Amino acid sequence: MSIIAINENGFLDKIKGRNPLFTCVISSIETTLSIPISGVHRDVIKYTPSADVELVFYGKSLTLKTPPIDATGSPTPATITRACVELKNIKNLHIDAGAFVKPKIPFIEIDEKPTGRIEEGKAMNNSKELYMKGYLLGKNLDAELLIVGESVPGGTTTALGVLLGLGYDAEGKVSSGSINNPHELKIKVVREGLKKAGINEKSSVFDVLNAVGDKMMPVVAGLAISFAERNKPVILAGGTQMSAVLAVIKEINKKVLDKNLIAIGTTEFVLNDKKGDLKGIVEQIGNVPVLASKFYFEKAKIEGLKNYCKGSVKEGVGAGGIAVYSIVNDLEPTKIREFIENKFYEWYKE
């Protein structure tokens, strides 16, 4: 099978044949407008989360002329997610937790305002409320399986901040959407924020989120806990950003992790990232399955897809997790690649 599994613990059997709901939680971070902590180009960073979910839901981006694409010509991972949605007929519903620009599709709004300034220790002041909104929303979503992704430019920096704030060894271990991972800049930004917010070992998980998290995190934690409490499996579809969500879940409700109903689903590109260590982070949190989908992009006809194998983009918009589900449920990964290749010039025509 084209899945790399660590601590699988029978999780793949739990998602086989299940009828899923895919949701992507989007947010923006004010810090990204002035400090280059994101791999997304500053000219499009305000529009990227909305353009991503528009592509997944509608089949094309509306907020931008084309779907997001990076400097190496690598298309947004939303192209992978769209392929799985289309090929496996997966229902999808998207959630705004503070994107700068709102998507031009139907969506659920949980918070209108973006995440604030991480370096000031002022990410938000309502993380507990956002958690409860995510939790209550999850209780009202009817699906046999939740696959939840994110599109948050700069989100690996907030992931680092939350992991450090909760006491994990995470410096130099979070991934990046770009080939050159600016570890030192990320560490400087979050250390400043943690210090200014007065975070210490007595601080609560919500204190840490309010200081250096992003608004996606408490929302996804609430969604995941609400599903797992009802004995429904959850794929946290993402890389090191979802490891931070996992750490938040552990702080709020450790018992749900012990049920073996929550797993991280990511891409081979994150798991094999030499400048990150998703496996090492998750092992500190608990015995949680980490599942990575393989795509065989080295055989792609499009150079931008081949660049994923060289460290570009890697993950996002739930790509790895929704692909894990799709592959377990009999979709050949070559079909994902072929779908993107067939649609590429339609999506990216000027």
Curated annotation (Swiss-Prot):
- What InterPro entries does its record include? Nict_dMeBzImd_PRibTrfase, Nict_dMeBzImd_PRibTrfase_arc, Nict_dMeBzImd_PRibTrfase_sf
GO MF term (any one): nicotinate-nucleotide-dimethylbenzimidazole phosphoribosyltransferase activity
S-S pairs: none
A Pfam family (short name) is DBI_PRT
Cite the PANTHER family for this sequence: PTHR38811, UPF0284 PROTEIN SLL1500 (PTHR38811:SF1)
As for family, the record states:
Belongs to the UPF0284 family.
This chain's protein is named UPF0284 protein MJ1598
Tell me which species this is from.
Methanocaldococcus jannaschii (strain ATCC 43067 / DSM 2661 / JAL-1 / JCM 10045 / NBRC 100440) (Methanococcus jannaschii)
